[in-house]
């Protein structure tokens, strides 16, 4: 409880990371004596320069669930390569029944993406992208599919290194 109070007294996160809440669900556990109510929170955290992480937390109270989710998201940060506020190439991500297609866009396009995908792009610093989700609209599955696709993206220099060529030879 002291951690929650200390966090609410500060104006923002002290580590400079952007935080976004995606979903809070009320969950119940049925036991012999009745129902036990709880809350599950889904959050994303990013530094605005390509690092992004997702976390989920469960607790009997909303603030504690959110705090747990934020801490998990901070522990799970992954670095994604960004070029001029967008991706290097078109990528597809899958998780469960969710499928996400992300297409790089020219400067000035903005973030054209729905719900949970938009939050992921905002915290990681992508400013121009077009994204479409297919299949499951479950926020957890959509975020995991988005992160799966982002982790599968590569730069031209990474492809060149794998092939043993230079970047100029790849584009020639």
Swiss-Prot record:
Residues of the S5 DRBM domain: 17-80
Alphabetized SUPFAM superfamilies for the sequence: dsRNA-binding domain-like, Ribosomal protein S5 domain 2-like
A Gene Ontology biological process term: translation
Domain of life: Bacteria
UniProt keyword annotation of Plastid present: no
InterPro entries noted in UniProt: Ribosomal_Su5_D2-typ_SF (IPR020568), Ribosomal_uS5 (IPR000851), Ribosomal_uS5_bac-type (IPR005712), Ribosomal_uS5_C (IPR005324), Ribosomal_uS5_N (IPR013810), Ribosomal_uS5_N_CS (IPR018192), Ribsml_uS5_D2-typ_fold_subgr (IPR014721)
Alphabetized GO MF terms: rRNA binding; structural constituent of ribosome
Keyword Secreted: no
A Pfam family annotated for this UniProt entry: Ribosomal_S5_C
Annotated keywords: Ribonucleoprotein, Ribosomal protein, RNA-binding, rRNA-binding
Gene Ontology CC annotations of this record: small ribosomal subunit
Assigned protein family: Belongs to the universal ribosomal protein uS5 family.
PANTHER family hit by this protein: MITOCHONDRIAL RIBOSOMAL PROTEIN S5 (PTHR48277:SF1)
Function, in words: With S4 and S12 plays an important role in translational accuracy.
Complex formation: Part of the 30S ribosomal subunit. Contacts proteins S4 and S8.
Swiss-Prot/TrEMBL domain comment: The N-terminal domain interacts with the head of the 30S subunit; the C-terminal domain interacts with the body and contacts protein S4. The interaction surface between S4 and S5 is involved in control of translational fidelity.
UniProt cross-references to HAMAP family, sorted A to Z: Ribosomal_uS5_B (MF_01307_B)
Name recorded for this polypeptide: Small ribosomal subunit protein uS5
Organism per entry: Variovorax paradoxus (strain S110)
Taxon lineage: Bacteria, Pseudomonadati, Pseudomonadota, Betaproteobacteria, Burkholderiales
